[in-house]
Amino acid sequence: MLRSSIAPSRQLLSPTVSRQWLQASRRCYSRVRSPAAVSKGIPAFTPRGHAFTTSARLANDPNIRSPPSPSSESTIPPESVPRPPPSHPIQTSPGSTIEGRTQPPPPPPVTNTPPPPPPPPPPAPKKGGRLRRLLIYLILTTGLAYAGGVWLSLKSDNFHDFFTEYIPYGEEAVLYVEEQDFRRRFPNATKQISRRAVEPRDEGQNVTIPGKSGVSWRVSEGQKETKEDGSDVSRRGKHMSATEANTAKEATKTSTVEETKAKKQVESAAPTTEKKSASETVKPALEEPRAPAIPTIDSVEPLSMLVDEPTVQELTKIVNDLIAVINADESSSRFTSTLSKAKADFQRLGEQIAVLRQDAQDAARVEIENARAEMERTANELIRRIDEVRAEDAAQFREEYESERERLANAYQEKIKTELQRVQEVAEQRLRNELVEQAIELNRKFLSDVRSLVEKEREGRLSKLSELTANVGELEKLTAEWNSVVDTNLNTQQLQVAVDAVRSALENSDIPKPFINELVAVKELASDDQVVDAAISSISPVAYQRGIPSPAQIVERFRRLATEVRKASLLPENAGIASHAASYMASKVMFKKQGSDDGDDVESILTRTENLLEEGRLDEAAREMNSLQGWSKILSKDWLADVRRVLEVKQALEIIETEARLRCLQVE
């Protein structure tokens, strides 16, 4: 089944792939079966609802898979290509046939005509719409940029100035969004601005209006204040307080009722005015100016923030909101005096609160100053006591240190003296014992000689054989003992000679030379001595592999190093090129000190180090150079390392020489 499903796709493959499929099919089918055998072995299957009628129908049926077409490059003829096996019929129930057929249809005839060539591949779709996509992306990007810019302009004042000044149409977009937001939050603001209070008029009477009469400028100012109150979003309104909105609604209802009553009074008085004559109604305009159509309203100014107290500021906001509501009302003249009095009382209360607050601040400031002075006095006293205690402790520690150091020095001196005296006494006693032994031996020898002569004279030579044998044994024992003493002395002398060879190799060399051979000779001569092994192990491998400089070379290198240190003596820790140049120029004009100097500057340290090197005290010179700081210490790092190696080698040689002397004294 897998092979039959792959067969239609072979037409789209290349000749190489087709050849591979053909070879694979040849491997899978070792022999070609005839169509009759195929038809007898496995019945053919047709789709549901179709039946085989003719051989042409079977040959042209698209549901029947055709064998793959051979490639033009293939050498296998089409007749030898095996056909794919037909699919098995599907049985719905046991014992039933497929589509009511009892006999399989005859197999299709096999023809030698090659199959038609495969259709050419469809052409690749042309890439188009690049300009259209570019325009769409550009429009979307511009829209998103403008939307983001407007949103940031509403959030940040700095970006608002930049966006409205440098971006085209940025100011119009921001204004449009702000206007829509304002209209959404205050839908009745424009209605209140355009509203005008107009008194009812009588349509049935003709009235001549003088030129200077009419609406006064104060009414316009009141309308302007109303407009400002309506457009000021920061003030308290219905969007900030629901209680004030209810109060405003009640005031509006009251004003509406009063307007209705006034209108009824005007309508009742209208018939009486119609009965009057025209001469009484029409008056000259220059004799008496008419009152304005709308009475002027004296608005009450809002309170200013007198105190920074949050409670007082909240009360001030409440009173200002109340004043704004009353100023917006048409009948605010009734509350003007009351509001003015309340405003004056509130201002006086604010001044009193400010005075009390100032007094409290002054009193607190005085208390703070007193507390600060007391704190400073206490802190100074505490610091003084701490300094005294610290000075006493330092003096006590210094005395204890000096006494302990003197005690340890005296103890070590006494110990060294005792050891030397004991070694001298042991050596003298050993010499005396040796002399006594030699005297005894001489006496014994003399006695033996006398006895031998006597025996010789008396008994002859045979009587002296036993004595001679005993004497020979004693002489051999004495010879062995003296040989060990001689070997020890010889080994000690060789060790001393090897140490002198190392020292001469280090002191007489003009350039640093390795002294591995000399050090190996010293180690072989003292192979069983742990002190000598420890001293040799303390020497750095770099020292005996590369050599160490001589004192003259150390002094010469120090003089070259001192010049560089003087150049870098004025550099800070994080110096740049300018600092290096300035330090180099300043080093040219610096005077070199001579003699002993007790200062801590770089020049004094260099002077003391040079004097110590001339005296041969390398240890103290290294300590002086190690006290440098900054770039000076960095430059002298290599020189200090060489001096340390020289001191390590020198100390090791001194230890080896001391151990050799002690071995000479310990010989019995």
From Swiss-Prot:
Ranges annotated as biased composition (Pro residues): 79-88, 103-125
Region called Disordered, residue ranges: 30-49, 54-128, 195-284
Lipid bilayer topology: Single-pass membrane protein
UniProt keyword terms in alphabetical order: Coiled coil, Membrane, Mitochondrion, Mitochondrion inner membrane, Transit peptide, Transmembrane, Transmembrane helix
Transit peptide residues according to the UniProt entry: 1-29
Task of the protein: Component of the MICOS complex, a large protein complex of the mitochondrial inner membrane that plays crucial roles in the maintenance of crista junctions, inner membrane architecture, and formation of contact sites to the outer membrane. Plays a role in keeping cristae membranes connected to the inner boundary membrane. Also promotes protein import via the mitochondrial intermembrane space assembly (MIA) pathway.
Name the UniProt record assigns to this protein: MICOS complex subunit MIC60
Protein's organism: Uncinocarpus reesii (strain UAMH 1704)
Lineage per the UniProt record: Eukaryota, Fungi, Dikarya, Ascomycota, Pezizomycotina
Gene: MIC60
